[in-house]
From Swiss-Prot:
Signal peptide: none annotated. It comes from the Bacteria. It is found in: Cytoplasm. PANTHER family: UPF0265 PROTEIN YEEX. This is Pole-localizer protein TmaR. It comes from Photorhabdus laumondii subsp. laumondii (strain DSM 15139 / CIP 105565 / TT01) (Photorhabdus luminescens subsp. laumondii). It holds the Pfam family DUF496. One of its GO terms (cellular component) is cytosol. The keyword Coiled coil applies. InterPro entries: DUF496, UPF0265. Residues 22-42, 70-104 form a coiled coil.
Length: 105
């Protein structure tokens, strides 16, 4: 009887190990994709900045362009924070409803 349980237990341990590895790989892939997106955005930002900066511009003009771009990006960040909060609220409400539905069964 002990021999029957050992392979089964070993299979469970192997399954758990593989499942954890798969999850770790998914997290690493998502992290790398985020890094790729971030760097692509940086390249795009530099391209946009180089389009605005023209020969003969004063330092004040360039600083003004940078300040305006920064303000635009900060506004976008605020919009994303608000959207995330709304999505989190909806997710919590759905979780509560699902929990209630599960308790009714």
């Amino acid at each position: 009887m002990d021999n029957v349980n050992k392979p089964s237990f070993h299979n469970v341990l192997e399954f758990v190990r593989m499942f954890r590895r798969k999850n770790k790989l998914q997290r690493e892939i998502a992290d790398n994709e985020k890094k790729i997106r971030d760097n692509q955005k940086r390249v795009l930002l530099l391209d946009n900045l180089s389009e605005y900066i023209k020969p003969g511009m004063s330092i004040e003009d360039i600083q003004s362009i940078i300040m305006n771009m920064r303000s635009d990006y900060e506004d976008r960040i605020d919009d994303h924070i608000i959207k995330n909060a709304d999505l989190s609220k909806e997710r919590r409400e759905l979780s509560k409803k699902l929990k209630t539905m599960g308790e009714l069964k």
